[in-house]
Amino acid sequence: PPPPPPPLFFSTPTPATAILSGLVGSEMCIRDRANPWESLENITKHPEYMWPNIDVDHIKWTGGGTWFWHHMYNRHKGKTFNFDHSNKKYDFLYLNKTHRTHREKLYNRLLNKGILENSLYTNWPEKKLPAKYELPWAQDYPQYGMDQDIFEKPYNDTACSIVSETNDNDHEVFMTEKIWKPIIAQQFFVVHGNYLYLQKLKEMGFKTFNNYFEEAYDLDRDPDVRINTIVDVCDRLRDAQWKDMYLRSQSLRQYNFDTFFNKEKLSTEINNTLNLFLEFADSSQVPS
């Protein structure tokens, strides 16, 4: 992959926020190596993503659940979208860009079982969307940096997003723009991501679709078992009564949209992340 952007790095008195102000008088320092647009797994596999190296106790701040929520909130707040879920032509919208082993496994399973026969899907750079479902500049689409844009047409014409997240491990939950786009679009979604991903999403104040279809895949700790369960769910969803499901789920989907664009709720989740700095400092691992 190309060199990552420089990480945020500071070794200073704690930020001048109300939540941290009590530490400043004690001359406490919090040393933070931050790369919040990456997951812990990615920076572990690619240590060059986390630099400069520092030989002191410190926190590795990675994206978790809030970085891309904050990023997408600021990118799309105040915009007017034209989403229309009244006429679905395809079953799934399934977007794969950067090649990753877990993505290849699910992609091949879905393809080989014929589940994607009536779907819009990509597997860059070999398989792309039809031109009419791409933004005008998408034929020269860069490998990195423009994934957060939203084009309504593919969401309007597909019933459900298969969210192809960055990682599928069982020790963190990393949420990217891939989940926030169908939430903004008020579309159904199935997530191929980390163990307990949906549970984390609900802990952050969102709702999922367990009243409409099976979401037991979220409880599958083994990533290969999780893939098997997701394949079964998607296979059954090809026969779903989407028009009825969209009518019955209107309030739920609107709730998620409103929650996403609720600055107070976003701030609460960000403050929960900041509390990790306090817990680290209170553990007396950081020298004063």
Model regions: which residues?
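Single conserved hydrophobic/aromatic residue that forms the stacking wall/gate
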Residues: 1-25, 30-32
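Pol beta-like nucleotidyltransferase catalytic core
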Residues: 26-27, 31-163, 169-176, 180-288
